[in-house]
Amino acid sequence: MKVLASVKRICRNCKIIKRKGVVRVICSSDPRHKQRQG
């Protein structure tokens, strides 16, 4: 899980979602693409 100021999709399987007011990226193909804005 990377904590970044600016979250971006790394691959086409990455999805940008908002959970409890926090912007996150989840990825089905590569778990290393997970990010959180903070």
From Swiss-Prot:
One of its GO terms (molecular function) is structural constituent of ribosome. GO terms for cellular component: cytoplasm; ribonucleoprotein complex; ribosome. Belongs to the bacterial ribosomal protein bL36 family. InterPro entries: Ribosomal_bL36, Ribosomal_bL36_sp. It holds the Pfam family Ribosomal_L36. This is Large ribosomal subunit protein bL36. PROSITE patterns: RIBOSOMAL_L36 (PS00828). GO terms for biological process: translation. Keywords: Ribonucleoprotein, Ribosomal protein. It comes from the Bacteria.
